[in-house]
Regions:
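Helix-start/capping segments and mature chain N-termini
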Residues: 1-76, 98-275
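Short, well-ordered beta-to-alpha junction loops that form the rim of enzyme active sites
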Residues: 92-93, 169
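Ordered, amphipathic secondary-structure segments that act as subunit-interaction surfaces
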Residues: 80-92, 99
Length: 275
């Protein structure tokens, strides 16, 4: 493996040289939050929005994070990497316990960790599986507590799929690592934000840009049948960009490859953020 630039508690090292305590609350309780900051053609995509979301996640867990220091470390990682295209993964945990305990001591220090890797933003068509959303009730926090996502995503892979689209009580929430959009002939739809949906940065950017372009978009509550009636479905994330769904496993659909509204949204996103 190549030497991957990383930082742990303010010290820059290669990823393989970093040692983390097994009593880190990130390790024992997933008591941590994270952010993924993409950059393309040496330009960071929506840096301030990503930092704001990380701060919001920290605030939700009562982490007193030094946002200025975190921002500086993320920028330093990107500069050290010499990659034109990639992303930074950055994580903040409550810290290291003297011994494992559900109740934490307020005196422990926050633990920070990040690394940078190369990534090419190449659009890929996906086969997805629809599944029940079995995650916890605060998916709006970008927490590392992702076991529900992990189990669903690996079940999808074992069944020949690339991703999942989840529903709770038959209402569409989000993908395993993405937000969901779909379209019919003249309108784009996406589930409204709630405690069951992460406020995706790519989701936010896309909504802003397509509104400015005059494309009709509706946020609301949509069920599985609404999704399956769609002419186009796509997923969005910081690493996927816009990824078109070509098949919903085991379901009859009306999907049109490269539907005009998907192509219009894709062109807008690529022009504004990936070129």
């Amino acid at each position: 493996m190549e030497n991957i630039h990383a930082v742990y508690n303010g010290r820059f090292k290669f990823l393989n040289d970093i040692k983390i305590s097994p009593l880190s609350r990130a390790y024992t309780f997933s008591d941590s939050v994270y952010e993924v900051i993409p950059f393309c053609n040496s330009n960071i995509i929506a840096f301030d929005k990503h930092i704001t979301r990380l701060k919001n996640s920290c605030d939700s867990l009562s982490f007193k994070a030094d946002v200025k220091k975190i921002s500086s470390e993320i920028l330093d990682l990107i500069n050290k990497s010499n990659h034109a295209n990639g992303y930074v993964y950055y994580q903040v945990s409550r810290g290291i316990d003297p011994i494992r305990s559900h109740m934490f001591d307020d005196s422990i220090s926050l633990e920070t960790f990040g690394y940078v890797v190369e990534h090419n933003f190449i659009s890929k068509s996906l086969t997805v599986m629809i599944c029940e959303d079995m995650r916890w009730q605060r998916c709006d926090i970008k927490s590392t507590s992702l076991l529900g996502n992990v189990l669903s995503m690996n079940n999808a892979r074992n069944n020949g799929c690339d991703e999942v689209i989840m529903h709770k009580n038959n209402l569409i929430t989000e993908g395993g690592a993405s937000n969901v959009f779909f379209a019919n002939d003249d309108c784009v739809f996406t589930p409204s934000l709630s405690n069951n949906i992460l406020p995706g940065i790519t989701r936010e950017l896309l909504i802003e840009e397509i509104k400015q372009a005059g494309i009709k978009i509706e946020e609301g509550q949509f069920d599985v049948d609404d999704l399956l009636r769609a002419k186009s479905i796509w997923l969005t994330s910081s690493t996927k960009g816009l990824a078109q769904v070509k098949e919903v496993s085991g379901k009859k659909t009306n999907l049109v490859n490269d539907h005009q509204l998907f192509k219009a949204c894709e062109e807008i996103f690529v022009k504004n953020f990936l070129s």
